[in-house]
Swiss-Prot record:
This is Uncharacterized protein YmxH. The keyword NADP does not apply. It comes from the Bacteria. One of its GO terms (biological process) is sporulation resulting in formation of a cellular spore. The keyword Ligase does not apply.
Amino acid sequence: MRLSELSGKEIVDIKRAERLGVLGQTDLEINEQDGQITALLIPTVKWFGLRKQGHDIRVPWHHIQKIGSDMIILDVPEEMPPRQE
């Protein structure tokens, strides 16, 4: 699958039934050694779509359960803390 095919898909946490963002607004963490995607870095958002600075949710790639035609379903552990920048 190409990155362009992933772009625009909604990211949903299956445990919380919560929309986390859209892949176009998300950063990817890539292993420089082998070029594999290791994690999604999802920015936290305040009201009206304004981004809260410095806080991202880091979701390891292996937490992705399913990539569908219009969404990506994640199984995010409850204890996963936000990433500080």
